[in-house]
């Protein structure tokens, strides 16, 4: 970042006025940007929808959908409105917002003409604005904060943004040519993210295929051809209930995406009574854990030594094995499906017993083959992890670009 831009950011943070900037109702902005209200640049569209138009939805994450929504995924409330004439037509370039969730960011520009719920506001733009620019501009914190302030309700759950409140919201906009250039830069960044997300999806498909083939013996790695054994799980693992501790080990929780994790690193705030820790089970590094959601996400591996809820079942190995092989196998679709068949009837919140698990026949390849398979799958995991980090960096770059370009802190050459 150029030093002049760094200096400008520092000045604005100190509430000092950089050269070429002025103070406005929304903060410090470029002097040549113009002040409008939404009522100055939008008029309400009240055209009815019809059966031939695709149904569009607004997401707080991605704005307006650009194609037909899968109606099987709609809420019951949405499905109940069978008379599509109650829906509103939304034309390409219109601004659409969900009255009930606009304060959370459910707002965006229409890319494909369609129809939206009667609970949405549809606003038709005039020629002072470039619609793709507004798709980004309306979702920066400065604008969402204003929308939040103009939304009314006894609680957040009941907040609504009505047309009369929408039209008095302030916005400071650059000239149309600058709007177009900014939108082009952000659209290019979106395409970079989209391309990398497609690569990630392909890597995940490849990993899933490898798991289906290698973990079950359907496909063998070169130089491995011996027969596999398929003993019952209880012949490989044993149920361990170790409460011989002082309750001073770190408390762990099961997660479906990261395995067993320290409870203070889990996003969900899980309450527990410190006095009950004496009843918790000790889990050691290398153990596996059957949690209350294992029927849904498989069995979790613990890279930590600590304490877990007494509702969990802790597994330790009875035979020599490669931890990483079974870490991968217990998260495979093949195993989860078989586990569900074995415990048919168990619902969320019910424990899978060791007896149910122990009767399952699971693969037990030779140790050297377990290790080789684990190495292949771990390499795939590393590629996926690096790609996810790359995507997150691109998203952070987009976030920074939006904050700098859409507020005028950084100007573009037109």
Task: Enumerate the predicted regions with their spans.
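A short beta-sheet element
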Residues: 85-88, 92-143, 157, 279-335, ...
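A short glycine-rich beta-alpha junction/loop motif
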Residues: 18-22, 99-100, 114-121, 154-177, ...
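Proline-centric
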Residues: 27-32, 122-131, 149, 163-183, ...
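DNA target-recognition patches
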Residues: 18, 45-81, 109, 122, ...
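Acidic, low-complexity, intrinsically disordered peripheral segments
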Residues: 402-414
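Short, solvent-exposed loop/turn positions at domain surfaces
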Residues: 23, 78-84, 155, 271-277, ...
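Amphipathic alpha-helical segments
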Residues: 31-34, 134, 170-204, 208-209, ...
């Amino acid at each position: 970042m150029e030093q002049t831009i760094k200096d400008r950011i520092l000045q604005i943070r100190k509430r000092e006025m950089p050269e070429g900037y002025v103070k406005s109702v929304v903060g410090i902005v470029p002097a040549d940007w113009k002040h409008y209200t939404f009522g100055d640049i939008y008029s309400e569209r009240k055209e009815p929808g019809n059966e031939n138009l695709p149904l569009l939805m607004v997401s707080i994450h991605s704005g307006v959908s650009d194609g037909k929504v899968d109606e099987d995924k709609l809420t019951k409330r949405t499905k109940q409105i069978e008379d599509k004439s109650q829906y509103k037509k939304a034309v390409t370039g219109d601004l659409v917002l969900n009255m009930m969730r606009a304060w959370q960011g459910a707002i965006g520009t229409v890319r494909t003409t369609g129809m939206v719920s009667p609970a949405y506001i549809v606003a038709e733009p005039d020629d002072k604005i470039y619609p793709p620019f507004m798709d980004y501009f309306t979702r920066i914190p400065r604008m969402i904060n204003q929308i939040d302030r103009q939304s009314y309700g006894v609680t957040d759950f009941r907040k609504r943004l009505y047309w009369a409140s929408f039209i008095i919201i302030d916005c400071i906009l650059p000239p149309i040519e600058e709007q177009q250039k900014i939108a082009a830069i952000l659209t290019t960044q979106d395409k970079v993210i989209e391309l990398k997300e497609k690569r990630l999806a392909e890597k995940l498909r490849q990993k899933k295929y490898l798991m289906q083939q290698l973990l079950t013996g359907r496909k063998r790695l070169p130089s491995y051809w011996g027969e596999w054994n398929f003993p019952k799980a209880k012949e490989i693992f044993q149920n361990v209930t170790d409460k011989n501790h002082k309750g001073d080990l770190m408390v762990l929780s099961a997660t479906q995406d990261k395995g067993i994790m320290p409870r203070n690193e889990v996003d969900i705030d899980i309450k527990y009574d410190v006095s009950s820790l004496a009843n918790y089970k000790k889990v050691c590094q290398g153990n596996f854990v059957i949690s209350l959601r294992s029927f849904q996400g498989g069995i979790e591996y613990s890279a930590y030594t600590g304490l877990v809820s007494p509702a969990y079942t802790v597994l330790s190995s009875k035979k020599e094995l490669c931890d990483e092989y079974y870490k991968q196998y217990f998260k495979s679709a093949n195993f989860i499906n078989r586990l569900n068949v074995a415990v048919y009837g168990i619902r969320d919140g019910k424990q899978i017993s060791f007896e149910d698990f122990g009767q399952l026949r699971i693969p037990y390849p030779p140790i050297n083959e377990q290790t080789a398979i684990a190495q292949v799958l771990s390499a795939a995991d590393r590629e996926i992890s690096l790609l996810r980090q790359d995507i997150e960096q691109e998203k952070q770059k987009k976030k920074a670009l939006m904050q700098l370009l859409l507020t005028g802190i950084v100007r573009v050459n037109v």
